[in-house]
Amino acid sequence: MTKTMLLATAAAFLMSGAAFAAQAPAPTGPTAPPLSGQAPLDDAAQKGVLVFTPDFFAAQRPNTALDMVDRVPGFSSDDGSGARGFEGAVGNILINGNRPASKNDAGTDVLERTPADKVDHIELIRGGAPGIDMQGYSVVVNVILKQGSSRQSVATWNAALFDGNHDVYGGSYQFTAKDGERSWSVLLSDGTSTSDSNGPGRDVIRDANGVRDQAFANDGWGGGDSARVNYSGPLAGGKLEATAQYGLHDWHEWQDVGAGPDLDHSDYVEDTKSGELGLTYIRPIKPKWTLETRVIHQFEHFDEVATGLQTVGGVAGDAQRFTAKGKSSESILRALVRHERTSALTLEAGGELAYNMLDTDQAYTEGGTPIALPSASVKVEELRGEAFAKGTWRVDPKLTLEGGLRLETSTIKQSGDASAKESFFYAKPRFQATWTPKANHQLRFRFERELGQLDFSDFAASAELDDNTVYGGNVDLAPEQRWISELTFERRFWGEGIVSVGYRHDKIIDVIDRLPLPGGLSATGNIGNGTLDRLSLNIVVPLDRLRFPGGRFTFKNDWNETHVTDPTTGKDRPISDVRPTQANIGVQQDIARWKTQWGINWLPLLGQGTYGPDQINTWRGAGYVESFVEYKPTPTLSLRAQLNLWDDFTIHREVYSNRATRAVLYTEDRDINPVTFVSLKVRKTF
């Protein structure tokens, strides 16, 4: 599959198609389907659930189930945080009422492999529903597949062609066989990785000696070969789902500042080998009682090399070299029992046990001379257990309540250059209320305690030689805690239209950010308490009534404001790596008679800052444009072209000579003109 490392990705604007069909979703229950252009009808018994049948997506002529899900109004797919464990770390996509058997085989990946003609209907579940595991999300989709027998192959070819940088090519082949409740598939993939922020520019450094203006250029690309096998079928009165995958992946990047005799060059290469096995078994144990068990194991071996060399007046300085080699793994055992006590009340309880490990050896040299790093060679292990209970109660057709409690205990042990052992215990309550006072109006409230998971790589040293920065490891990390209060109002109109406004406040305990270490180094660590306030707005306007047939207008943005006390200066500042704003404005259209869709999305402003003890690094982008056109001459063939334009990307770095006084040693301004690139994709089903 194709992986794209986009600075603009957080906007989630990779458009799979264009406007909605001029129909409204059909409700669950024995109600008549709505006429074209009418507002969606709610299930008379459960107003938080809307059902979208294939007719709703007909004008789009979707290729895959993911194309259909991407067009569900009011929903944005999320594959989860990828954090350790299963509970609270997976996505908001269910297939036949359950999540995929593996964490790495994300919901969007499964749907992208599922042909659209295999979808019976899609349920949009807002605020919870009996028998549905929301996993902390306010909104999820449940894709229900058709039964029957079939054999199908899907082949894809894709390319990313850059104006002056490294081009990449990939493709995949999948065979799927289905016979009633039993199915199996094989996927062979030659994937690609790219970055949209590379290109030429200028790098200007200002210090006490004056101004140095130099040329700048960079590039980054990668790919991977993988094979995956999936199976699903009945077993011993229940259903078994299994998946296994093995892959080889690589990433290359380089950066040049200056030219000729005055040149700073850095590069980075990473090679990984990874695999996983996932098993899910679901079985009724008595009327209204269901047992669900999961076993997941995944592993990775990695080898990384980063180098840097500065040449001044034709004389090379001491070469920098940072290497990291190691392995990581995760094993999860999870079981729960679900009791559908009544049609309005579902209770479930269970537990999860997980073991995680990272074993890495790292080294840093300058001119061939080893430089000692804190926690350069470490092994980090975590044994974590969690017990949970939750319930969903549909008080009446207009009101649904969901509540639960998770009790987590974990022990993290570190050995190697530094030894440490810490144990943690946290109670994580959750409450959500969903009120639908009348059709097309919904109010959702959520209160929850979330616990962030520690990134094992933060326990070990690391380097970013493109800006001459080396980080030490930190053995004293503790999880970040958030008390979240969130209120969302949703209003649907014109059948496919929606306006959603949400406000969220996080009280953050033990914020994880950059902190100072002795010896002039810095590391990732806990820097104190902080807050986040977020205003979210999501708008979809169908344009048929405005004489733009098959068209729609979209707007989506999160405005974030964060506060934390800087551990170096003692002053209030934003939390690192949180984007204050990133509006996504788009127009798309289906032209059925031409069997074509087109669209354009614009991000007027994006960016974020990283605040360290010795430097502040901020990047800003403006005027990011992505446009596409997709032609489907037959139901089994699609041709898609996408153009990405971005000519305004700047990085500002302020470096200090003294942590206490914050005296500026120099500033660096990098103005990059990211290269334009075209993405091509051909998909054929046979």
Question: Which functions belong to the PLM regions below?
Answer:
Residues L41, L50, L66-K103:
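Extracytoplasmic beta-strand/coil segments of soluble accessory domains associated
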Residues A65-M68, A83, I93, D109-V110, ...:
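N-terminal periplasmic accessory domains that precede
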Residues R99-R126:
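Short acidic/polar hinge/loop motifs at secondary-structure boundaries
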Residues R228-H249, Y268-A420, T436, V501, ...:
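Face-selective signature of the C-terminal outer-membrane beta-barrel domain
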Residues T272-S274, G326, A376, V380-E382, ...:
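Outer-membrane beta-barrel signature, preferentially recognizing the C-terminal barrel domain
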Residues H301-D303, M357-D359, Y364, T411, ...:
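Surface-exposed extracellular loop regions of Gram-negative outer-membrane beta-barrel proteins
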Residues V499, Y503-K507, G525-T610:
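Gram-negative outer-membrane beta-barrel transporters
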Residues Y631-F686:
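C-terminal beta-signal and adjacent terminal beta-strands/loops
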